[in-house]
Amino acid sequence: MIAVDGPSGSGKSSASKGVARELGLRYLDTGAMYRALTWWFMTENVDPADTDLIAARAAEPSVEVSADPGNPWTRVDGTDVSSEIRTQEVSARVSAVARVPAVREHLIARQRAIIAAARPGVVAEGRDIGTVVAPAAQLKVFLTADPGARARRRAAELSADAGETEAAQARRDRLDAAQSEMAADALLLDATDLTLDEVIEKITRLARERGAGLFIPEGAELVALPGQGQEDKGSWAWAGDQSS
């Protein structure tokens, strides 16, 4: 597998999807899972400061994320929320939800099961993917960029003002500091002056050199998770102890 880590706005998602398409691999956006849960708590009017309630209800919603890098989507209880989870409101709250230990324990277990089930391999991206979720990944890349470049990318994604986005991003970096540690065996890639195609090419070349992503780590437990139709090339679900 290939693990792509890095701060918000560094281009993790776009690069990971591109690499997965180039190599014919599955794709896992771990951040979308945290965002989906955050969005659901917002619709339930749960105070992000109420960590006990968040911990108690973390397994309630059914959340699915697409495994197809060419058709990424996120669903909560069967409803597509791919756009809703990318708002500034969700971005402002997701760090608080992600810091709740019960939430992290629940989602990390799901993410590891998804990675173990992925065939022929997976490009997984998100905070602490290479240090906590998948420390045995064959290739780990820590993607970064200067604050201005990251803010511009995030602003384009959220259709927001770059100046406001940079301030919000700095705040989130402080909140996410514990999950932003670079793995000791990761390769640092500064994308500040690189195009998306150049980033994809560099990671793809490294993966081919190492043979990363073309097999599942030895000893990994296979967990059967149902797909959602040929057009989606499979999907991954987590909902309490059930797949849906």
Q: What are the roles of these predicted feature ranges?
A:
Residues 7:
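P-loop (Walker A) phosphate-binding loop of NTP-binding proteins
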Residues 66, 111-119, 129-136, 160-202:
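Small-molecule kinase domains that catalyze NTP-dependent phosphoryl transfer to phosphate-bearing small molecules
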Residues 82-157:
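ATP-dependent NMP and nucleoside kinases share a basic, alpha-helical "lid"
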Residues 4:
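Hydrophobic anchor at the beta1->P-loop junction of P-loop NTPases
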Residues 12:
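Conserved lysine of the Walker
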